[in-house]
Amino acid sequence: MQQTASVNMQDFGYVEQFLDAMWMERGLAENTLASYRNDLMKLLQWMEANHYRLDFISLSGLQQYQSYLVDQDYKQTSRARMLSAIRRLFQYLHREKVRADDPSALLVSPKLPQRLPKDISEEQVDALLDAPDPNDPVELRDKAMLELLYATGLRVTELVSLTMENISLRQGVVRVTGKGGKERLVPMGENAIDWIETFIKQGRPALLGETSSDVVFPSKRARQMTRQTFWHRIKFYAVIAGIDTDHLSPHVLRHAFATHLLNYGADLRVVQMLLGHSDLSTTQIYTHVATERLKQIHSQHHPRA
């Protein structure tokens, strides 16, 4: 079965209506919507080539598409993500009475290996946070951002989109709008507060110049920084700190925040609230990282290990 670049326009319309509904009802971020669109366009292209339509494709047809993805060597994680988009689409079509049934409900999800978040030690975190030169406005901004990330466990997308009204230095909290438009208040800690205050007074005016902006951490062009740019900045400082960048991810400080809290006995549900996880099982993966770290310390320092 071949895949072509064309799609049925009626099916395309259904997908666009679905994406609009996801944006309005669930407040999904642009990145998530773009991922849904990309995955669903692949489905529509395959359907067009194989004479299926959204309003009559059966469970068997969707299973054929799953087999096609396996034949095309898509990773398990990619196939699981695509299946998630497909299920949401067919749930929507069933709800809107485009279909009398939901064939996706019986699809079997690919089994995913449990992946532990990439972990760095407290010493490596200290080295990373000490890498920026606070005498330079750009690096002072980066220093404040890194301190805030480690203090709060924010997602990178949440960090770069912060506005001045989201931060209360007096109360010591940051108000974050996370996935699905859910708001949460996260304490910042004195160290992060001090560096943010220093940046706002000394570094931010130098970056903004004559430009007005509500963004807390503007780029050199006085715009909102992209998450890709900030990831490049993290890798830049990791090299300075002597940390192997192959062992880093954009959320390295979010992972360190969660793992180190658990290492020091924080309650799992408190960590869940701080991270903005809707499901406790998502947070529980960090307990495995914390346990592995404790085992490592035990084997290194116990005389009978």
From Swiss-Prot:
GO terms for molecular function: DNA binding; tyrosine-based site-specific recombinase activity. The keyword Cell division applies. GO terms for cellular component: cytoplasm. Disulfide bonds: none annotated. Keywords: Cell cycle, Cell division, Chromosome partition, Cytoplasm, DNA integration, DNA recombination, DNA-binding. It is found in: Cytoplasm. Site-specific tyrosine recombinase, which acts by catalyzing the cutting and rejoining of the recombining DNA molecules. The XerC-XerD complex is essential to convert dimers of the bacterial chromosome into monomers to permit their segregation at cell division. It also contributes to the segregational stability of plasmids. Belongs to the 'phage' integrase family. XerD subfamily. This is Tyrosine recombinase XerD.
